[in-house]
Amino acid sequence: MVKLVFARHGESEWNKANLFTGWADVDLSEKGTQQAIDAGKLIKEAGIEFDLAFTSVLKRAIKTTNLALEYSDQLWVPVEKSWRLNERHYGGLTGKNKAEAAEQFGDEQVHIWRRSYDVLPPDMAKDDEHSAHTDRRYAHLDSSVIPDAENLKVTLERALPFWEDKIAPALVDGKNVFIGAHGNSIRALVKHIKRLNDDEIMDVEIPNFPPLVFEFDEKLNVTAEYYLGK
């Protein structure tokens, strides 16, 4: 059976500080680096061999991908980076402490912004220091494509073309695939893979560790789903 392994990036410095991160390019914490290394070791123990890998354009996912491949002795595997695998854009919440945001806007409102499938958080100002509109890595994109805020619905809409153009064809071709990405971009793809409805995906959480494995038949029907080491 062909395998797809999702690894959410290890703990980031902003995860550690309980801040909304989104598209902010935050590095891994010491714990997160170790989680990525341990992910690679679990992959090696499981004997999973990859043909190609995909990740976002954010360093926490890129470093997780590189470390996981290195410690599974597969650092040579081709890696393609795409903004379509980025974390959900948290808009004006980016950089805010989650507890302080709850105090400012109310627990219920922040919960809706975080967990609702189709409610958008406040937009990020285009002159914000974390705005993608002035970030060189997105210079090739039309400005109308660059988000100022996203919910899970929008995250899936921008990740889905990459799934259909790159990931799914590789799986159909019998290739084992590694994806180093983010909690919400992985959740969005899991919703599509498992054909979950809008309510069912709200209860799905993706931990920083360990990696999540899907096995598929030739028609991309899920035949197995499990976390490595569990």
Swiss-Prot record:
This is 2,3-bisphosphoglycerate-dependent phosphoglycerate mutase. Catalyzes the interconversion of 2-phosphoglycerate and 3-phosphoglycerate. GO terms for biological process: gluconeogenesis; glycolytic process. Substrate binds at residues 8-15, 21-22, 60, 87-90, 98, 114-115, 183-184. The active site is at 9 (tele-phosphohistidine intermediate), 87 (proton donor/acceptor). Keywords: Gluconeogenesis, Glycolysis, Isomerase. Belongs to the phosphoglycerate mutase family. BPG-dependent PGAM subfamily. Its EC number is 5.4.2.11. SMART domains: PGAM. The gene is gpmA.
